[in-house]
Amino acid sequence: MNRKKIIVAAVIVALLATLAYGWHYYRQQNDASLTLYGNVDIRTVNLGFRVAGRLASLAVDEGDDIHPGQTLGKLDDGPYLNALKQAQANVQSAQAQLALLKAGYREEEIAQVRSEVAQRQAAFDYADNFLKRQQGLWASKAVSANELENARTARNQARANLQAAKDKLAQFLSGNRPQEIAQAEANLAQTEAELAQAQLNLQDTILLAPSAGTVLTRAVEPGTILSASNTVFTVSLTDPVWVRAYVSERHLGQAIPGSEVEVFTDGRPDKPYHGKIGFVSPTAEFTPKTVETPDLRTDLVYRLRIIITDADESLRQGMPVTVRFPQR
C-alpha cells in the first residue's frame, strides 16, 4: 500500500514539474523581446543632365555633402542660347503676321486696288468695243476669221483680268478670311511652344541637386561630350535611412507598421538608434543569404522596412544592425 502511494506521489510531482516548466518556458518565450538582424539600406540616385552637350564644369567631388538646389555642374550653354534667340525671333514674326491679318488692309492698299479695277475695267471696255467692231467688219468680209478670233480672245482675257481685280477688291474690303487668321494663331501657338522648350533646355544645362545627400562617385570630367541622361554623379540620400530586416511567420504579429523599435550597431552597442516599422511585405520569401540569424536561413520570412528617425552619418550602406522590439 505504501509502495502505491509513493508511486502516485511521484507521478503527481512529475506532472507538476512538467506543468511548471511548461508555464515557465511559455512565459519566457512571450516575455522576451523580439530581436531581428538586418542591414542599413540607403537609397542612391544617379544624376545627369536632361539635355546633351559638352560638360563645361563640375562644382563638387566625391565625398562632398550637397543640399537641395545646389549647383553641381554646367554644360556649355552656347548652342542653347542660340536656339533660344531663334525661338524668340520666330515668336515675334508670328505675332506680327497675326496682327497684320487681324488689322486688315490699309486705305492706301484699298485705293490702289480700286485704281487697278478701274484700269482693268477700261481695258475690258476697249477690248469689248474692239470685238464688236471686228464682228461688224467680219460680216462685211473686211477682216479675216483669224483677226475676229484674236479680238474675241483679247476681250475674254480682259474680262478675266477685270474679274480678278474685282475679287481682290472684295477681299480687301471684307478683310482676311477667318481661316487665315486661325492658321496664323496656330502658327503663333507653335512658335510659343518652341520658345518654352528652348527656355527649358537652357535651364537644363545646369545640374541641380534634387535633395540632400553625399556624392559617392563622380563619373565624368569637364570637356566630356554627354548624351542626355548620362550619369554624372551617384549620390546617396541622407533621408530617409532605412533598415531592411526579415521576420518569421511566428513573430509576424509583433511587426506592426508604426511600431517603435531600437536599432543597434557594432560601433555603438549601448546607444541605440530609434526607428519605426514603415512597411511589412504582404508576401513571404525564402530567407536571403545576407540574413545573419542561422535559425531563419531555411524559413520563409517577411521583409520589413524600418525607418530610422534619428539617423546620422555613422550609418553606412549595408552596415549590419540588430533590431530589438520592446518587451510585451
From Swiss-Prot:
One of its GO terms (cellular component) is periplasmic space. Keywords: Coiled coil, Periplasm, Signal. Residues 80-109, 142-209 form a coiled coil. Residues 1-22 form the signal peptide. It comes from the Bacteria. Its main location: periplasm. It is found in: Periplasm. NCBIfam families: PRK03598.1. Belongs to the UPF0194 family. This is UPF0194 membrane protein YPTS_1292. It comes from Yersinia pseudotuberculosis serotype IB (strain PB1/+).
